[in-house]
Swiss-Prot record:
Classification of source organism: Eukaryota, Fungi, Dikarya, Ascomycota, Saccharomycotina
Membrane topology designation: Single-pass membrane protein
Classification via PROSITE patterns: CYTOCHROME_P450
UniProt-annotated location(s): Endoplasmic reticulum membrane
Protein name: C-22 sterol desaturase ERG5
Keyword Endoplasmic reticulum carried by entry: yes
Enzyme class at the top of the EC tree: oxidoreductase
CDD domains according to UniProt: CYP61_CYP710
Length: 538
């Protein structure tokens, strides 16, 4: 016991001695720390705040220089911290083009986001195909609006497996089942467009919103069939722009009441609730032996068949999806299609109306494939015969690609080129527009020339430049749907309506709102037309 006490006394004495030595002969580090504390004590709060701000500003510039490396971009951040935030609130197409022309790789920095833009075809393809290094990136608030459990946020094998379960929904055979109901929607909106023009005394009026509505109606009918009502379609079509506004590249990362993100979240929840109810009706329809007439039906049929299948892959890829899962997936289909298809519709009607020779060729082809029999209903074989109509659609997609850029986030340091490695956490954006306007592949790329897509032509053989729908593991699921739907839509409108576009100084100017639109919002008039004689009725 006494030995333990002696040890304690000795230990305490030793520590006391060390403490005294530290006081008598302080180390350099301790001296420096005390010096800094004394300095801070003598400073006012204002001076401390100003010093911290200066340190932050210097670090912001230093971090930018380190990440920028040798690629094109502003030498310094002209606006500290925020970068070109104010300019991004009103994006201009001309500024995008200037950025793409500045170099194969260029950069900007907005707040905490360092953004690298790739403007060449090969760099764009490399990024789109490098799922090991990158994954699709949406704005921070998208996770809250689309929901964290949504399949679009899956990565790697989980994403691949989920996607395989969806592939069967957008094959030509599946899409053929949706055509009869789509034709009914087209007929209804042709009558509506003619009526709107008549009520306006055939004076030019903006059709931007009507184009968004018809494309939303076509998409929702493809996805949900007759399970969704006309009122529900109209409500979603009217409010969907709130989702687009909420998911703009620059926005609040949190949801605050009565802001864009708040309204966007409300709209998304409303739409997904409708889709949940539709999913249950589709399950009931298939369980009762009904045939698929929409995407939900086809999905439920795959699940139903998988239950009785001996194929392991079928059971894995077509497990029993809940109504909530189906509703979230269908909302992402709408999210992926609505703005892009609305953009294509606006440009397609403007471009064709402004080129009477193109419109005449479309009408001639439409009569030929129907053998002048106007009772012929839309079907897959009919649409596949519309060679020129499809060339017009493809050239519109090249000439005015709805999607200019696709944002990705870097998962780990990514050697994008021999001279530059994109840092982890950076936003990496492959640009699609330059590849589609490459003069080495597309002669006179800024001219609209449908004939460039004749089979065997230089353009049709340049598969690597055709990036309208992306490439790699996240290539667009709905590209076949787009071509089929728009060939049917343009063919019917060309035959049964006489549509005219009023050209303004802003018609060929590009407005960027998620996708691209004519700046004057598309001034059109529609009149009823006899498809055989060409007679126009008022």
């Amino acid at each position: 016991m006494s030995s333990v006490a002696e040890n304690i006394i000795q230990h305490a004495t030793h520590n006391s001695t060390l403490h005294q030595l530290a006081k008598d002969q302080p180390s350099v580090g301790v001296t420096t720390a005390f010096s800094i504390l004394d300095t801070l004590k003598s400073m006012s709060y204002l001076k401390i705040f100003a010093t911290l701000i200066c340190i932050l500003l210097v670090w912001d510039q230093v971090a930018y220089q380190i990440k920028k490396g040798s690629i094109a971009g502003p030498k310094f951040k002209f606006w500290p911290i925020i970068g070109p935030f104010l300019e991004s609130l009103d994006p201009k197409f001309e500024e995008y083009k200037a950025k793409w022309a500045s170099g194969p790789l260029s950069c900007v920095s907005i707040f905490h986001k360092f953004v690298v833009i790739a403007s060449t075809r090969d760099l764009a393809r490399k990024i789109l195909q490098s799922s090991k290094f990158v994954k699709p990136c949406v704005v921070d608030v998208a996770v809250k609006i689309l929901r964290p459990c949504n399949w679009v946020f899956l990565d790697g094998k989980a994403h691949t497996d989920y996607r395989k379960s969806l592939n069967g929904l957008f094959t030509k055979q599946a899409l053929a089942q949706y055509l009869p109901s789509l034709e009914q929607i087209m007929d209804k909106y042709m009558d509506k467009f003619v009526r709107l023009s008549k009520e306006n005394n055939y004076e030019p009026q903006v059709f931007f919103h009507e184009m968004r509505e018809i494309l939303c109606a076509l998409s929702l009918n493809s996805f949900c069939g007759n399970y969704i009502t006309e009122d529900q379609v109209r409500k979603i079509a009217d409010d969907y722009y709130l989702v687009t506004a909420a998911l703009e590249l620059v926005n609040f990362p949190i949801i605050i009441p009565y802001t864009k993100t708040w309204y966007g979240k409300k709209t998304a929840d409303m739409a997904m609730k409708i889709f949940e109810n539709c999913a249950q009706m589709a399950k009931d329809h298939i369980a009762a032996g009904g045939k698929p007439v929409c995407v939900m039906d086809a999905w439920c049929k795959l699940m139903h068949d998988a239950k009785n299948s001996n194929d392991d892959d079928s059971r894995i890829y077509h497990r029993e999806f809940t109504n909530k899962e189906i509703s979230e997936a269908v909302f992402t289909f709408l999210f992926a299609s609505q703005d892009a298809s609305s953009s294509l519709a606006c440009w397609l009607f403007q471009i064709v109306a402004d080129r009477p020779d193109v419109l005449a060729k479309i009408r001639e082809e439409q009569l030929a494939v129907r053998n002048n029999d106007m009772s012929t209903e839309l079907n897959l074989d009919l649409i596949e015969k519309m060679k020129y109509t499809n060339m017009v659609i493809k050239e519109t997609l090249r000439y005015r690609p709805p999607v200019l850029m696709v944002p990705y986030v870097v998962k780990k340091n990514f050697p994008v080129s021999p001279n530059y490695t994109a840092p982890k956490g950076a936003m990496l954006i492959p640009t699609l527009y330059p590849a589609l306007h490459d003069p080495e592949v597309y002669e006179n790329p800024d001219e609209f020339i449908p004939e460039r897509w004749v089979e065997g032509s230089k353009a049709s053989e340049a598969k690597k430049n055709w990036l309208v729908f992306g490439c790699g593991p996240h290539v667009c699921l709905g590209q076949t749907y787009v071509m089929i739907t728009f060939a049917a839509l343009l063919g019917k409108f060309a035959l049964y309506t006489d549509f005219h576009h009023t050209v303004t100084p802003l018609s060929e100017k590009i407005k960027v709102f998620a996708t691209i639109f004519p700046k004057d919002d598309l001034l059109l008039t529609f009149k009823k037309r006899d498809p055989i004689t060409g007679e126009v009725f008022e």
